[in-house]
């Protein structure tokens, strides 16, 4: 079943809320997840009828790659918070792939 852009939006929002609330999250991860949100806002703005354009999706995926790497490297991050970042990354990858 294909991933809808709405699901990507929700997964990124959940990950951002959890990272912001996790006192163990590194400042680097917090900054990277904020950039992920910024790229999401740009993608939403450039979309047509709720469908993001391809270039924006690629940019968003790159931000997701950075967020995933930062979450994996953050040893003090709560496991459920790490999982939410990984879920956001996976959602954007699936959207890009059309899966």
Please provide the spans of the model-predicted regions:
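Context-gated lysine
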Residues: 11, 39-45, 68, 94-96
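Amphipathic alpha-helical binding modules
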Residues: 65-99
């Amino acid at each position: 079943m294909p991933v809808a852009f709405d699901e990507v939006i929700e997964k990124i929002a959940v990950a951002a809320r959890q990272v912001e609330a996790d006192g163990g999250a590194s400042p680097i991860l917090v900054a990277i997840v904020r950039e992920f949100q910024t790229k999401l806002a740009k993608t939403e703005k450039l979309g047509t009828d709720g469908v993001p354009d391809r270039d924006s999706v690629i940019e968003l995926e790159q931000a997701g790659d950075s967020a995933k790497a930062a979450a994996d490297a953050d040893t003090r991050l709560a496991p459920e918070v790490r999982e939410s970042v990984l879920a956001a990354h996976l959602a954007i990858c699936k959207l890009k792939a059309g899966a």
